[in-house]
Amino acid sequence: MGALQSAWGYAKDLDESLNNIRIVTGYSSDKMAEFADKANKAAKALNTTTTAYTDASLIYYQQGLSDAEVLERTNVTIKMANVAGKAAAEVSDQLTAIWNNFDDGSKSLEYYADVITALGAATASSTDEIAEGLEKFAAVAETVGLSYEYATAALATVTAETRQSADVVGTAFKTLFARLQDLELGETLDDGTTLGKYSAALNAVGINIKDTNGELKDMDQILDELGGKWENLSKDTQVALAQTVAGTRQYTQLVALMDNWSVF
């Protein structure tokens, strides 16, 4: 009886998932039958259930994506969900934040998941933790010119060094990078920091935050220049500079990143 109930429940969930896709897409019965067959085959190939596959597909159809885009994203999502041991719905939210903010079309969508998976295997943080941490600051990172490679490596480095969770570090990074974003808009931060003060602190150690055209440099370049000078600065200078750049609440994360620049 238990097996029968389980089978009935599975069939009911699958039917509901497929019906939701039909509602979102407006597909005909024949089109949905074709989709269900393809989903079943894809799910078997990815070692997951058809319902898990269709649930993930539904999320991407709700974003207004094409069949081809949904197929690619669903396959990547299921693969990463299997590695992370998480529900596809949760992983899809994380990957959507990453793709929407970092993907410029130059790399495959799977590349972004592969980077997280590799870092999860190489560090004390899990794939899921790194993805969750990235989700916290992906939007602001893209705005200030922090590349995906820098963002993921910085997150993994600071997480490993401080033993803080990727979620905590990701939230700290969001605040840290948002400072530069707010300053560029002409705001004065809560601690009294202005763009002039921020710029002067870095200028004092030989770093100009603007390029020859007067445009703000990408955060990748600013971090590169700071990392190259860090070990030659006194501890007092390091702390004072980190507090201006990152703020008094987040400066320890910046110090941890700079202290480990050689392995970053």
How should these model regions be labeled?
Residues 31, 69-70, 237, 250:
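Single-residue recognition of alpha-helix capping/boundary positions
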Residues 203-210, 214-264:
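Hydrophobic, often aromatic-rich secondary-structure segments at membrane interfaces
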Residues 1-44, 55-63, 71-84, 90-123, ...:
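Small-residue helix-packing and pore-constriction motifs in hydrophobic alpha-helices
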Residues 46-49:
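N-terminal glycine-rich anion-binding loops that anchor highly charged ligand groups
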Residues 161-164, 242-243:
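Short proline/glycine-enriched turn/loop segments at secondary-structure junctions
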